[in-house]
């Protein structure tokens, strides 16, 4: 069980990983955990490295520390000088710090550069049973591999750099059991938005979520990463999925994955990580995937969602006063009226990318909708691959040409429009169909209005100029992934 007694049977995936990594334990205090992989980027690391420098400390395990540039990087012509002074300083600082402290860096011009939560898995750095941290909220992405992965603050980044350990209270464990099969035209993004819509943005506060069930097992690794990525949006500390044959097939042969006899030994060990049949969870939530339709967020948090076939809710229909007030504020910010059909909402911008949906399967799904069609007049649409490797693969498959011919902008890898921290931002009042993970006020730029959707739904909105049920377009040709 989530707070299980050491040595007892019935351990969860979290129990097993946690116990392997406890360096020190004292009654009434947090456990000291060993960290297997520390991922670093340009935004949350400068102060941490400076703290080491001032204290005369070194990075304890530079071999377990990997850095990349993602949050602030330009996604247009990288041969031009950086125009954002803050971004330029942060990237220069990361280069200097990695050089001084011996940390491997995938810089702006590396073929392996990309969003930290995309490159970790694709390089085989992310593996089952590991503890993984990063100074970023969406580190939970790596939990799709059966790892314990969570975001940390800048002071904790410094602590891990210096000691390779971290003090942590053990969270409770919530099982989210996803029954049934995803209907045609629905995706992992629709699934996780539906789950957050059901349990709320604070529904998993204090927990690590373990996702189980038929629908989860049927997902590809990229789909599982999408689900785990947004666990934090339900308030969870992390999201996890037990490793299985799908996990092993994805990892085999990747640059940093074990090879030869080490691979066989690793897989044998990884098979033991799954929660025991008699494991007891602190809370169990069931979700019916079979009833899911493509989902669109209407408000200013990821729990404010409805099916694409639905309408904007009326705040008066919320029994809880806090939810009613939040709905009123969200509708005012989003400039929407209760009762408006989702498919009547017109959009100005489309963003396909991010650590949630910037992988090759996401781009294939969007391209399947876009192929042979054109972006609607007045809509500006862009595709930003999650990494240089994803970009190269997409170009090898001709996906970039499909997007370009339809009128999309094809960009370099980076976080881009997921957050208003780089040149790719919304103007005040612009409305965007986005495959990212947060629709908070101003998240994509001051006054910008964000609707969270799957890559296929974003592509469909770009073509129509408003939200449409992607299943109707797919019926004419192509298939969602």
From Swiss-Prot:
- Keywords per UniProt: 4Fe-4S, Amino-acid biosynthesis, Branched-chain amino acid biosynthesis, Iron, Iron-sulfur, Leucine biosynthesis, Lyase, Metal-binding
* EC number(s) stated in the UniProt entry for this protein: 4.2.1.33
**Which leading EC class covers this enzyme?**
lyase
Q: Which domain of life is it from?
A: Bacteria
Detail the disulphide connectivity of this chain as listed in its UniProt entry.
Answer: none
Instruction: Give me the residues that bind [4Fe-4S] cluster, please.
Output: 355, 415, 418
Supply one GO molecular-function term: 3-isopropylmalate dehydratase activity
Q: Which processes are annotated in GO (biological process)? A: L-leucine biosynthetic process
| Cofactor binding notes | Binds 1 [4Fe-4S] cluster per subunit.
Looking at the keywords, is Iron-sulfur present? yes
Which pathway features in its UniProt record?
Answer: Amino-acid biosynthesis; L-leucine biosynthesis; L-leucine from 3-methyl-2-oxobutanoate: step 2/4
Swiss-Prot/TrEMBL catalytic activity: (2R,3S)-3-isopropylmalate = (2S)-2-isopropylmalate
InterPro entries tied to this protein: 3-IsopropMal_deHydase_lsu, Acnase/IPM_dHydase_lsu_aba_1/3, Acoase/IPM_deHydtase_lsu_aba, Aconitase_4Fe-4S_BS, Aconitase_4Fe-4S_dom, IPM_dehydratase_rel_enz, IPMI_cat
Tell me which cofactor or cofactors this protein depends on. Answer: [4Fe-4S] cluster
Role = Catalyzes the isomerization between 2-isopropylmalate and 3-isopropylmalate, via the formation of 2-isopropylmaleate.
What does the subunit section of this Swiss-Prot or TrEMBL entry state?
Answer: Heterodimer of LeuC and LeuD.
- UniProt cross-references to NCBIfam families, sorted A to Z: leuC, PRK05478.1, PRK12466.1
Can you tell me which family this protein belongs to?
A: Belongs to the aconitase/IPM isomerase family. LeuC type 1 subfamily.
This one is known as 3-isopropylmalate dehydratase large subunit
Q: Please tell me the species this chain comes from.
A: Symbiobacterium thermophilum (strain DSM 24528 / JCM 14929 / IAM 14863 / T)
């Amino acid at each position: 069980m989530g707070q299980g007694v050491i040595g007892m049977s019935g351990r969860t995936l979290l129990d097993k990983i946690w116990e392997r990594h406890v360096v020190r334990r004292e009654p009434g205090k947090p456990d000291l955990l060993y960290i297997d992989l520390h991922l670093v980027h340009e935004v949350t690391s400068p102060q941490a490295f400076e703290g080491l420098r001032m204290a005369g400390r070194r990075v304890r395990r530079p071999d377990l520390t990997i850095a990349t540039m993602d949050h602030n990087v330009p996604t247009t012509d990288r041969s031009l000088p950086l125009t954002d002074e803050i971004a330029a300083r942060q990237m220069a600082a990361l280069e200097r710090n990695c050089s001084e402290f011996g940390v491997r860096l995938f810089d702006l011009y590396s073929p392996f550069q990309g969003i930290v939560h995309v490159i970790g898995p694709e390089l085989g750095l992310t593996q089952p049973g590991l503890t993984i941290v990063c100074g970023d909220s969406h580190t939970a992405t790596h939990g799709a591999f059966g790892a314990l992965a969570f975001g940390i603050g800048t002071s904790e980044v410094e602590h891990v750099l210096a000691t390779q350990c971290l003090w942590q209270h053990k969270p409770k464990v919530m099982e989210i059991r996803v029954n049934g099969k995803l209907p045609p035209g629905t995706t992992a993004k629709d699934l996780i938005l539906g789950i957050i819509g059901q349990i709320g943005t604070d529904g998993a506060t204090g927990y690590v979520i373990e996702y189980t069930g038929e629908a989860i097992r049927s997902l590809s690794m990229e789909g599982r990463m999408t689900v785990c990525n947004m666990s934090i949006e339900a308030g969870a500390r992390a999201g996890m999925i037990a490793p299985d044959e799908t996990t092993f097939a994805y990892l085999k042969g990747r640059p940093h994955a074990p090879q030869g006899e080490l691979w066989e030994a690793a897989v044998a060990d990884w098979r033991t990580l799954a929660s025991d049949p008699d494991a007891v969870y602190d809370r169990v939530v069931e979700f019916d995937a079979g009833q899911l339709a493509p989902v669109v967020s209407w408000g200013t948090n990821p729990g404010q969602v409805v099916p694409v076939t639905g309408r904007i809710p009326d705040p008066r229909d919320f029994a809880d006063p806090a939810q009613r007030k939040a709905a009123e504020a969200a509708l005012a910010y989003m400039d929407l009226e209760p009762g408006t059909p989702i498919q009547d909402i017109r959009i100005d911008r489309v963003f396909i990318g991010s650590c949630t949906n910037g992988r090759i399967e996401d781009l294939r799904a969007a391209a399947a909708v876009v192929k042979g069609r054109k972006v609607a007049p007045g809509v500006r649409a862009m595709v930003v691959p999650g990494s240089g490797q994803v970009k190269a693969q997409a170009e090898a498959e001709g996906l970039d040409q499909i997007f370009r011919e339809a009128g999309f902008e094809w960009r370099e890898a980076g976080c881009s429009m997921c957050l208003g921290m780089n040149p790719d931002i919304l103007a005040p009042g612009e409305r965007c169909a986005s495959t990212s993970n947060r629709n908070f006020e101003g998240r994509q730029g001051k006054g910008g209005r964000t609707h969270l959707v799957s890559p296929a739904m974003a592509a469909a909105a770009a073509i129509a100029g408003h939200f449409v049920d992607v299943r109707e377009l797919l019926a004419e040709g192509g298939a969602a992934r």
